[in-house]
Every structure is written in C-alpha cells, then in structure tokens.
Curated annotation (Swiss-Prot):
Compartments it resides in: Nucleus membrane
Described purpose of this protein according to its UniProt entry: Has a role in maintaining cell viability during stationary phase induced by stress response. Activated by the spc1 MAPK pathway.
Cellular component annotations (GO), alphabetically ordered: endoplasmic reticulum; nuclear envelope; nuclear membrane; plasma membrane
Species lineage: Eukaryota, Fungi, Dikarya, Ascomycota, Taphrinomycotina
Annotated organism of origin: Schizosaccharomyces pombe (strain 972 / ATCC 24843)
Keywords: Membrane, Nucleus
Pfam family, one: Ish1
Subunit architecture: Homodimer, and heterodimer with bis1.
The UniProt record lists the keyword Transmembrane: no
The keyword Ligase is annotated on this UniProt entry: no
Name assigned to this protein: Stress response protein ish1
Length: 684
C-alpha cells in the first residue's frame, strides 16, 4: 500500500508540474468540448458559458484560483490538498481512464491490422478458387515437402476441396520465399489443355496463332494482373479505413486522456507508426501480387537435372568428354558419401568369413593330429603287448634255440625304432601344418581388416605416430619427410613385420609407470633424454634406454627386464590417467570434446591399436594369432564370433599337446622293448 501511494504521488506531482509549466495554453487552442470536459472532471462550475471566447476569458480570470499558489499555502493546507489528490479513489479513476484509452487504441490498431490481413488472405485464397481438385493435388504433390514421399501422396486423395485450397494457400507462402513471388512454377503442373479450358471458362479469347504454352501462360498472367489491378481500389480503401480508425483513436485519446494526455499521445504515436508500417508492408505485398511477372521454368535447368541423374546413376546424355568426366566425378562423390556404409558392411562380411575359415582349418588340423596320436598310441600299445609276448617266447626258447632268440630281439628293437620315428614324423607334420595355416589365416585377416579401414584412419595419425609405426617395424625413415611420404611408407609396410614385445610392453605403461622405469634404468644410458614429461616422449626415452641396455649392459639386467615382456599384449588403459588418454588420442588425430568420456576414449584407442600393433611377437595366446583375431573381431563388430577365435587358439594348443603325448607314448614303448631285449641278451 505504501509503495502504491508513493507511485500515485509521483504521477500527481508530474501532472502538477505539467500544469505549472504549460498552464492552460493547450486548452486555449482546443475546442470548447475539451475545456468543458476538463472543468467537469475537476468539479469546477463554468455556468452557461459555451463559446471559445467565453471559456478563454473565464480561464484567464480564474487562473489564480484554478491553479493553487503552493508557495503561499501553510503546511496544513498543503497536507489537506495533497491528501485529497492522493486518495485511492482519485488515483484509481486516473488509472482506469488510462487503461480504457489504451484498450480502445489497441482495438483500433488491431482492427486496422486484421482488415489488412483479411484483404491479403482473401486475395491469396482467390488465386486457387478456380483450380480443380486434381490440379490442386498435382500442385501440392509437386511443390509441397510434406506430400513429396510416395507413401504420403495418398493423403491428398482424402482431403476435401476446401482443405485442398486451404493447404495450397499455406504452402504458397513458403514457396514464394523459395522460388519467387510470381514465377510460372505455380502452373507447371497444368497441361496445355487445362490452361485453354481455364481461360475459356473465365472468358478470355484465344486465337489460332496463340496455341503454344508460352502464349497461354502470357494470357493467364495478363488476366490475373488485370484482376489484381481491379482489386487495388479495395486495398487502398482498406488502408484508408485503417488509417481513419487510427486517426479516430488518436482523437479519442486526445479527448479522454486528461492530465495523462502527454503519455497517451506518445503511445498513440508509436501504435500509429506500427499500424502504418504493417499496412505499408501489406500494401507492398499486395502490389507484388498484382504485378504477376515471373520466370519461365528456370528452376528446372538442364545442368541441375543432369547433376541429379549423374549422382543417382541414371543415364543422361553427355555431349562432350569433359561433361562425361564431370558426370563420373559426381557419381564417385555420391558413392563416397552415401555408399560407404554398404562397402564397409561388405568388408565386415569378408573379414567374418576369414575368421570362420581360420577356425575351421585349425579344427581340421587338430583332428588330424589327434588321429595321428591315436594311431601312434594304438601302435605303441600293440607293440608293447607284442614285446611282452616276444620276451616270454625268447625266455622259453632259450634252451632250444639261442640264435633264434637273438634274432627276434633284434627284430623287435628295429620295429620299435621304426614305429617311434613314424609317429613322431606324423605328429610333427601336423603341428607344423597347423602353425603355418594359422599364421596365414591371421595374416589374411589382418590384411583384410587393414584394407578396409587404413584409408579412413591412418591419415589422421600425427607424423610422430607414423614414424613410430615405421620405427617399430625396422623401416628406415628419412630425416625430412612430409606427411604424404610417411603415409606412403606406412601403406607399403602395413602387412609386413610385427611390433616387438618390448615395444608393446612400454606402450602398455602409463606415464607414471614409464617415469618409474626410466628412473630405475637410466643409469645404463649415457645419451641425452628428452626433458618433456608427456607420455609420447617418455615412451621414446624408455625405448632408447632399452636398446642401450640390450647392446652393452649386463645380461642379468637384460634378463630381468625381458622377463616382463612376454606378458605384454596391447595397452589395457585401465591404469592410465585421463591426461595419458588425451595425449594418446591426440597422437592418433582424434578430437577431444569439452566433456571427456573415459570409456569412449579407451574404446577409440583400442580401435586404433588394431591397426598400429597387429600381431605382437610373443608366445602367449592373447598376444599372438588368437589374441589378434579376437581383437579384430571385436573391432569389426561381430563380437558373437569370439567363441570361434577362442576355439582356434585351443585347437592349436591341442595339436602341441597331442604331439607331446604321442612322442611320450612311443618313447615309453621303445624303452619297454629295449629293456626286455637287454634281459633276453643277458639270459642268452
């Protein structure tokens, strides 16, 4: 309540200031109605006065009594007068007058705007009144994006005539901004016969030499332009009516605003300018419609159609070799941007087949080795039984025929040696075949994977990463090499060699672990280390120290270091800090978002590692052929095939175990025979 009283007092003081500053000079220029209104609202009797001169004389004579001389008033009189002028009823009355005046002004402006908008909508809707339903459907199917799809064209058949016209009028707004206000595209769905029929229906004569489409369109445009010109007076009348309403609203405000006249006049002026601006814009738009001057099918240029046909593989006439060349370029660009997914899917399928083939071959090799082992074991068992029987025969025949016993013992010994040699050869051949086949399959799988993705990934690698790739494979790198030269070398040696396990070991370590390793072994290195503490340079320092140790240091130190290498596969990244991960991604040329996702970063690094490492030179299954195939399978997206890759590793190990068992069985059989032969010889 207190804030309201203060605000009201401020309004009242502004009114008093206005009266003291300008006096009644404004009302001396106005008509008597304004003076009467002011006197009545302030409860000042004016008697029978009616003419302007009477009121001017009355105001001049009574000026001192009407305008209080506050300087001469006592404090009591001032408080009394201000109390009356700050009563809530008095202030509410002033506020109500201002609100009513504002509403009337707003209503007048809205009426003017609505009248202009109605005239425009009526003019726009009349454009499609004479169209048939089929013409409207063809127009919308051709130009409206919401009905462009084949499955949505059936919706047009269900729309009523009124809905078709309403939809066409709405689409017209969007199309005019896109294709131009008055282009011939509006009628490009009409046939020549439909144009003639329409002109005939509206009474436009067509002579025999005006039968071409260009003549028909010109006739149609002239007719519409004439009708638009005839409607121009109506548009001007609407504008005049709106202006008159705005003027009347301004006069009404001038009559009713009272002491707030200055404020309301300002609002009236702003609203009048806004209304005038909108009416002017509406008039200009209607004027544009009346011109009806547009283009003749320029939107469907031959070059645009050819470009569309070329990109989508549609045969189009190419008059010259250079046109054929550009058509080929457009086709290749489309395949690169839109056909890449199909090509990549095909590569995935091929890599999947390679993995299946690897598993099948290894399984067959293992089966063959198992059969060889079983044959060797069975033969050894039979030979053992035969050896026992023969030994008994030798002992019993000792008294009868000494020479015969000696001959049989020699035969048994020769047979055991022959059987052991044959079994060992078969098992060895099976194991060698399994290892050779698995190596070929792994190489083929690696080649297929890399052929699929090297062009899209390695080009993002930094120069330092490309040099490291070549360095770890023993490929000499020129001192000054450009990015293109490095890429050529990487592509050339992509499927050659493998990363040594000591390099793989260092790449599994975080920057903290690398720093600790360097601190422990740098005493064996007398060269200069890079001072930077980022992971890239720490890795280079560790490699330099290891090579120095391998060349000169004590063998016990080297063996201690190398004992950890067979455990190295590829980086697991679990112990790496976020800064290490970001540094590694930066080396691979991957972007790092504002919000760092650790899990996503690790996945991206593992995908790059498939290309960078390949099969790591080590004896463990995880870092050898089987591990590489599993990582390839995971990267290519067919994780369900992991069982096949695991089985491949198991089958290879089974071949090795089978060879060991077969050799052991044959050796045992040979030892048994040898023992019994010696016993027989001692007896003899």
């Amino acid at each position: 309540m207190r804030s309201r009283s203060v605000a009201s007092l401020g309004v009242l003081l502004a009114i008093v200031f206005y009266i003291f500053t300008y006096g009644f000079s404004t009302y001396r220029k106005n008509d008597t109605s304004a003076v009467k209104t002011w006197l009545e609202e302030h409860s000042i009797p004016y008697g029978s006065r009616s003419s302007p001169s009477d009121f001017q004389q009355f105001i001049s004579e009574s000026y001192d009594s009407l305008v209080p001389n506050l300087d001469k008033w006592s404090g009591h009189n001032l408080n009394s007068w201000l109390g009356k002028k700050t009563e809530s009823s008095y202030l509410d009355a002033i506020s109500n007058k201002i609100r009513k005046t504002g509403r009337k002004l707003s209503g007048s402006v809205e009426d003017a705007r609505d009248a202009t908008q109605e005239a425009w909508e009526s003019q726009k809707a009349s454009l499609f009144e004479s169209w048939s339903d089929s013409q409207l459907r063809a127009f919308l199917a051709r130009h409206s994006p919401q009905f462009a799809a084949k499955e949505k064209k059936g919706i047009l058949e269900k729309l009523s005539p009124a809905s078709l016209r309403e939809t066409a009028a709405k689409e017209y707004d969007a199309l005019t901004s896109k294709l131009g206000n008055t282009g011939d595209w509006i009628y490009d769905t009409w046939s020549d016969n439909e144009l003639r029929t329409w002109l005939h229906d509206v009474g436009v004569p067509i002579s025999s030499h005006e039968s071409t489409r260009s003549h028909l369109l010109r006739k149609l445009k002239n007719y519409i332009s004439t009708k638009a010109d005839e409607a121009q007076p109506s548009v001007e009348a609407v504008k005049g009516k709106a202006s008159e309403k705005a003027k009347q609203a301004g006069e009404f405000v001038s009559d009713k605003a009272g002491d707030a006249k200055e404020l309301v006049n300002e609002k009236s002026s702003e609203a009048g300018q806004y209304a005038g601006q909108k009416m002017e814009e509406g008039g200009e738009l209607l004027q544009e419609i009346s011109k009806r001057r547009g283009r003749f099918g320029n939107w469907w240029a031959n070059s645009g159609l050819k470009a569309y046909f070329d990109a989508h593989g549609i045969p189009a006439y190419q008059p010259s070799p250079i046109d054929q060349f550009y058509a080929h370029l457009r086709r290749q660009y489309y395949l690169k941007t839109n056909g890449y997914q199909a090509l990549k899917s095909k590569a995935y399928e091929e890599a999947s087949n390679v993995a299946d083939s690897a598993s099948s071959i290894a399984s067959n090799v293992a089966s063959g080795a198992t059969e060889a082992y079983q044959g060797a074991a069975s033969g050894a068992s039979r030979f053992t039984e035969g050896a026992k029987t023969a030994a008994e025969s030798v002992t019993s025949a000792f008294e009868h025929n000494k020479d015969t016993a000696t001959s049989k013992a020699k035969q048994m010994k020769g047979k055991a040696a022959s059987l052991g040699s044959t079994a060992s050869e078969k098992v060895g051949e099976a194991a060698d075949y399994a290892a050779e086949t698995a190596s070929k399959v792994a190489s083929k799988a690696a080649s297929k994977v890399r052929e699929t993705i090297d062009e899209t990934i390695i080009e993002r690698w930094q120069d330092s990463k490309l040099k490291e790739f070549l360095f770890l494979r023993g490929v000499p790198v020129p001192q000054r090499s450009t990015k293109d030269q490095l890429l050529d070398l990487v592509r050339k040696h992509f499927n050659k060699g493998a990363v040594p396990n000591w390099a793989a070991y260092f790449d599994t370590l975080s920057s903290k672990e690398l720093s600790a390793w360097i601190k422990e072994y740098k005493k064996h290195y007398h060269g200069k280390l890079h001072p930077s503490k980022d992971r890239e340079h720490l890795f280079q320092n560790a490699c330099n120290i290891y090579r120095a140790i391998a060349e000169k240091a004590d063998k016990s130190v080297l063996q201690s270091i190398q004992s950890k290498f067979p455990k190295a596969t590829v980086p697991g990244y679990d112990s790496w800090s976020n800064e290490d991960l970001k540094s590694a991604l930066k080396e691979y040329g991957d972007s790092i978002g504002k919000v760092f996702n650790r899990k996503d970063a690790i996945e991206r690094l593992k995908r790059h590692d498939i290309l960078f490492y390949g099969p790591v030179v080590a004896d463990k299954a995880k870092s050898g052929v089987s591990g590489f195939l599993r990582r390839v399978a995971s990267f290519m997206g067919f994780g369900t095939r992991d069982v096949a890759e695991i089985k491949l590793g198991e089958n290879i190990q089974k071949v090795k175990d089978t060879a060991s068992k077969a050799s052991s069985a044959v050796s045992s059989a040979g030892d048994y025979v040898e023992t019994n032969v010696k016993k027989a010889q001692r007896v003899l």
